[in-house]
Amino acid sequence: MKNTSKFQSVVIVTIVGWLVLFVFLPNLMIIGTSFLTRDDANFVKMVFTLENYTRLLDPLYFEVLVHSLNMALIATLACLVLGYPFAWFLVKLPEKVRPLLLFLLIVPFWTNSLIRIYGLKIFLSTKGYLNEFMLWLGVIDTPIRIMFTPSAVIIGLVYILLPFMVMPLYSSIEKLDKPLLEAARDLGASKLQTFTRIIIPLTMPGIIAGCLLVMLPAMGLFYVSDLMGGAKNLLIGNVIKVQFLNIRDWPFGAATSITLTIVMGLMLLIYWRASRLLNKKVELE
């Protein structure tokens, strides 16, 4: 028992130490830096200021933040529209086949997402496979310009984040009470009524979780907008990258990071509140 207790203590201390060293302290440094200034040599100056946060209200940066939210929202809706039927299809397959398709869904995670975006860029380029195939079919006369447009950024985000939508949806759909669906059909409910009044409410936790897992990282995937969208389709993640690596304005980059973290925190709070309300509603029913 003593050895077990010592082992548990060592594990707990190790985990806490790791979190403090690599999570708490770095975030504390970022928060502190966001309230400082920089000098002419681009070094952080120990002078307190709120200017870094007020700069975010500048139309240029505020527009990028709103654009990031819009792009993340569109990508989330696209993932939901594509992911829900796919998750439903997975659940309806025989149990022997499901593990194989789930494995194929997870396989892309074994490859770096940056490499996958490079592959997608080649596929969608003016001289890429998609345009060449459509020209061969005679569907188009001249190559379609897809790259370096907002649509290309959306395609890239959906390509990277779709599995994050499918997995929670699959879990929720798999847990559906089949006798309840059969009872609805026996009582005369149409397929549309069954879907809107029973299936959607019961799978809402999976929908909310999937939307959250897609929307939160979508605003920060700067390399997707860099490679697919170009300079005219920046996300807030690109602003943070430029401030830290190019301009070396660390205080403003830190303030932008904290603002993005707060936005994500508000989304998590909304998810938590929505989950509680849904659970209460289910308990009452």
Model-flagged regions — what are they?
Residues 2-8, 39, 53-60, 218, ...:
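Interhelical loop and adjacent transmembrane-helix boundary motif
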Residues 41, 50, 117-158, 192, ...:
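Membrane-interfacial helix termini and adjacent extracytoplasmic/periplasmic loops
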Residues 15-24, 103, 107, 159, ...:
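Transmembrane alpha-helices
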